[in-house]
């Protein structure tokens, strides 16, 4: 097996009415757990990393580990650039073997966003890499960068149609009230915004900020056209909480192979639950 584009993966999800989970990876253990669980459940999978993740782990290391895991588990993997903004950085990573890109120009005016995204599409498609872009502005914190809720903007359906047509993107990240990070109160998603977008846009839709959303909200979003669901913070919390608990019980512990076991088990529970909610088990 090998590293693939996420394009056909998402088109199949769109056709059959489920969603592909994109789990943000942070270290070797995250990658091991996510891939192993997806393989056991025969689920399609996207491994996503922010610029901070690739800086921490090294793009070459991420690609090499993903290729090895794909071979071990006989699982095609999409390794994805999440919320990247710089064309030169994206170019280097695509040339290193990445085949799925999210270019985020959502903080820019519409015309600037279109121009940036179009340039990334032209570059990425030469390498058979798929491109996702965001229209609207998501609240919350990602990679230590924050957007206040008051500054978040929903995706405009008519602009969405124009954006997809002019840029040639393969999937569209929509903003309907989700946010990066965990929610201080139960979010109220704008589900009514999804049908007008789906009617005007023929590419798969992406939902960011799905950590700790009620399962019913995720399922409803999928029923209205969402084909990719991003989960990041929920994995980090499970991992870190399990580590904290282990050291509370074993304050003198110093063997990573021991204390990583409960941390990986906690993440595995999250991955299994998300795959079930997305309805993608057995869809390889």
Swiss-Prot record:
So where's the catalytic machinery, residue-wise?
A: 82 (proton donor)
Q: Name one GO cellular component term.
A: cytosol
Task: Cite a single GO BP annotation.
Answer: D-tagatose 6-phosphate catabolic process
- Detail which positions bind dihydroxyacetone phosphate: 181, 209-211, 230-233
Q: Which UniProt keywords apply?
A: Galactitol metabolism, Lyase, Metal-binding, Zinc
**EC top class, in one word?**
lyase
An example of a Pfam family matching this protein is F_bP_aldolase
- What Enzyme Commission number(s) apply to this enzyme? 4.1.2.40
- Which pathway features in its UniProt record? Carbohydrate metabolism; D-tagatose 6-phosphate degradation; D-glyceraldehyde 3-phosphate and glycerone phosphate from D-tagatose 6-phosphate: step 2/2
Transmembrane regions listed in the UniProt entry: none
> Can you state which reaction this protein catalyses?
D-tagatofuranose 1,6-bisphosphate = D-glyceraldehyde 3-phosphate + dihydroxyacetone phosphate
Describe cofactor binding as the record notes it: Binds 1 zinc ion per subunit.
The answer to whether UniProt assigns keyword Lyase to this entry is yes
- The organism's superkingdom is given as Bacteria
Tell me, using the record's free text, what induces this protein.
By galactitol.
Coiled-coil residues: none
Q: For this protein, what is any one GO molecular function term?
A: zinc ion binding
Per its Swiss-Prot or TrEMBL entry, what cofactor is needed?
Answer: Zn(2+)
Sites binding Zn(2+) sit at: 83, 180, 208
Note the NCBIfam families from the entry.
cbbA (TIGR00167), PRK09195.1 (NF006626), PRK12737.1 (NF009374), tag_bisphos_ald (TIGR01858)
The record's family statement is: Belongs to the class II fructose-bisphosphate aldolase family. TagBP aldolase GatY subfamily.
The entry describes its oligomerization and partners as: Forms a complex with GatZ.
Primary role: Catalytic subunit of the tagatose-1,6-bisphosphate aldolase GatYZ, which catalyzes the reversible aldol condensation of dihydroxyacetone phosphate (DHAP or glycerone-phosphate) with glyceraldehyde 3-phosphate (G3P) to produce tagatose 1,6-bisphosphate (TBP). Requires GatZ subunit for full activity and stability. Is involved in the catabolism of galactitol and D-tagatose.
Instruction: Tell me which PANTHER family the record gives.
Output: D-TAGATOSE-1,6-BISPHOSPHATE ALDOLASE, D-TAGATOSE-1,6-BISPHOSPHATE ALDOLASE SUBUNIT GATY-RELATED
Q: What is this protein called?
A: D-tagatose-1,6-bisphosphate aldolase subunit GatY
Q: Which organism is it from?
A: Klebsiella oxytoca
This chain is encoded by the gene named gatY
């Amino acid at each position: 097996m090998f590293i693939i584009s996420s394009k056909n993966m998402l088109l199949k999800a769109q056709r059959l009415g489920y969603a592909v989970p994109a789990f943000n990876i942070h270290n070797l253990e995250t990658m091991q757990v996510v891939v192993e669980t997806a393989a056991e459940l025969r689920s399609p999978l996207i491994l996503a990393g922010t610029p901070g993740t690739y800086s921490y782990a090294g793009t070459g290391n991420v690609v090499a580990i993903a290729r090895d895991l794909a071979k071990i588990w006989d699982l095609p993997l999409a390794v994805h650039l999440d919320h990247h903004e710089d064309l030169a950085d994206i170019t280097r990573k695509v040339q290193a073997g990445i085949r799925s890109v999210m270019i985020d120009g959502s903080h820019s005016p519409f015309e600037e966003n279109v121009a940036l995204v179009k340039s990334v599409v032209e570059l990425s498609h030469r390498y058979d890499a798929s491109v996702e872009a965001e229209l609207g502005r998501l609240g919350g914190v990602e990679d230590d960068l924050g957007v206040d809720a008051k500054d978040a903007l929903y995706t405009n359906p008519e602009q969405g149609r124009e954006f997809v047509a002019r840029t040639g993107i393969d999937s569209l990240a929509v903003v309907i009230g989700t946010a990066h990070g965990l929610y201080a109160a139960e979010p109220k998603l704008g589900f009514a915004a999804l049908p007008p977008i789906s009617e005007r846009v023929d590419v798969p839709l992406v939902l960011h900020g799905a950590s700790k959303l009620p399962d019913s909200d995720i399922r409803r979003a999928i029923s209205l056209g969402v084909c990719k669901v991003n989960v990041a913070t929920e994995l980090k919390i499970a991992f870190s909480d399990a580590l904290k608990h282990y050291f509370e019980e074993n304050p003198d512990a110093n063997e990573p192979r021991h204390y990583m076991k409960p941390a990986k088990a906690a993440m595995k529970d999250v991955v299994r639950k998300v795959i079930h909610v997305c309805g993608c088990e057995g869809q390889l």
